[in-house]
Amino acid sequence: MKKYLLEIGCEELPPKAVDTAISYFKERLEGLFENFFEYRTEENISVFGTPRRIGFILSNLREKEPSEEKTILGPPAKVGIDEKGNFTKAALAFASKNNIPVEQLKIIENEKGRYIGATLIKEGKDIRTFIQEVIPDLITKIPFPKLMRWNETGFRFSRPVRWIVSLLDNEVVSFSIAGIDADRYTHLHRFMTTPTGRGERKKIPDVDSYFQIMKLGFIIPKYEERKEAVKTQLTGFANSINAEPVIDEDLLDEVTNLTEFPVGILGDFSPEYLILPKEVIITVCKVHQRYFNFEKDGKLIPKFLAFSNTAVKDREKVKSGYEKVLKARLEDALFFYEEDLKHNLEDFYPQLEGIQFHHKLGSMLDKVKRNGEIAVLLSRELNFENLKDLLRANKLSKCDLLTEMVKEFDELQGIMGMHYALKQGEKEEVAKAIYEHYLPKTSDDQLPETDIGTLLSLSDKLDTVISFISIGEKPKATADPFGIRRNSIGIVRILVEKGIDLDLKKLLQDISREARKVKILRLADIEKEWEIIFDERTIPEILDFIEGRFIAYMKDKGFDTDIINSVVSVDSYNLYRNYLKIKSIQELKKNPEFTDIMTVFKRVGRIIPEEFEEHFNPDTLVQDEEKELYRKYTEVNKIFSKDVEDRRYTEALNELLKMKPFIDKFFDNVMVMTEDKKLRENRLSLMKLINNMFRKIADFTKITT
């Protein structure tokens, strides 16, 4: 079996470009070479990527892909052969059309009859030919975020390509890209193998020697190994100063893809800068310098770890350079901080009028006002009484957007608002809510902890979703420029994970009515006039969108799709209750009799005609079985309804299970679809009563068993 190596040598690739190439190769290679792998194993594909090289090694490759046998059928035998046994014009035309030699024609029998046909053998391609055909196209289609041209060939790539290694075992498989011929020569580390910064040009004799040559050339090609080297050094330096590293996964990924041979250098900064909020120092180090911080007992210490792409001779000189650059950045941050503290946060509130939220949705001040109206309605629904602090937090929630610190570091919005509010004497819960109203920022981010923060977060996200859907700006499959999908996921997570019992439909109806009072959306091109865009007609679209995010969230949690659909099909408005219902049915599925239970429940639902209107009269019941079923229904429904009201869905389902023997007995002994119309409709009405009870939890007909 053979191995194949591809290495594309480039000028310095951006970290995201390295990520893109690695992901792309991992997605494409297995399918592309599936006919050449001798067997499936994780060892077949080894992808690597650094700032100066991307590529892969394929193992367990066949010399040649398997031949394919294909049978082609032509006209029926009675049409393709004449009385003398010769092929007719129809058979000859079939052979000519498919480039089949006449001598290969034969009669082929199948279940449909006898036909003229042929069995063709398609020879498998040689691995070398296949590589020459597909690899140039594979390289060309790497979906880099940005592309550039650099020579007369017009080839586009993330950065200029400088060399290509293409080896099948010890043999060069030639092709050309961007005017460069594939060969067996690579370049080693730029600074640690030559003084010129070009890197030693090195011959790769065969695929098996590649990683050893890289190691000797001070290169760690594999992303995972390089990342582990960064983490090991980070932990080691932390231990040496008796501290804990502040590990940021995004920074870890970025530093990994900025280096081929990461070397950590421990530095210091003046303790005077510790007057700055912790998040400011961490952000300055991360965004501007790609430095890691350390802390003791949850507090930052004045040290950092930078990573060089080379082992340096004069470590103190390099360390001093890192420290000087960081000092300048921290000095700027301290200036911003002190300037911001000269103003009360509330002073910035009127200036929010000057920040456009969206040209159809008014200013950031308009949004804050809308958020406040929604927060009031939410507090009413959830019996939250501290309106004074809620509205105070809402008023201050976006004010830090006007501060110098947030203008410089937009990722600190909310965080700086919290710190400035605390400095200026605001209540702790009010200050914390300014930060928390942005949470969660991602699908796995932390949730707001305070009640005010939770209400403001929901209000802010609801306004964003409502507003953009109302003006027709729903996200596309691959683009969500206004964060509607992200905000919807945030709404789902807050309601479900914090156990908030909220009827979204009722809330949206309340907001719609309130919109007519506060003029929730402004018409952009008429300065003094307003247009009511959000009304009840938009509510189903908004609910459908949020429901879609809820369904995806439930699937990610491991719940069965059919169970999820059975619940949301009868009520998609209260996400927390729906979660509890789904969880309870999923638990019930562990019952060995689940299939039998569902069969009975589904039979009740399926026997009722569509659009059937229930007109039940207990006096019309005739047989003992239907009378017993009705008595059991009235008994169960009383307890069941109370359990549902109190969100005790497991107990409610257990009540429903008590119906099963009575339903079985009813179907075994009572003819529902009798010719007597009065009896038939009364029995169907009884079924509908029972099914309506079932549907307070789910539409069991949608559950597959």
From Swiss-Prot:
GO molecular function terms attached to this record: arginine-tRNA ligase activity; ATP binding; glycine-tRNA ligase activity
Keywords of this entry: Aminoacyl-tRNA synthetase, ATP-binding, Cytoplasm, Ligase, Nucleotide-binding, Protein biosynthesis
Location(s), subcellular: Cytoplasm
A Pfam family hit: DALR_1
Keyword Lipid metabolism part of the UniProt annotation: no
Keyword NAD: no
Reaction(s) the record says it catalyses: tRNA(Gly) + glycine + ATP = glycyl-tRNA(Gly) + AMP + diphosphate
One biological process term in Gene Ontology: glycyl-tRNA aminoacylation
Protein family according to the UniProt entry: Belongs to the class-II aminoacyl-tRNA synthetase family.
Name this polypeptide is given: Glycine--tRNA ligase beta subunit
Organism: Persephonella marina (strain DSM 14350 / EX-H1)
Gene that encodes it: glyS
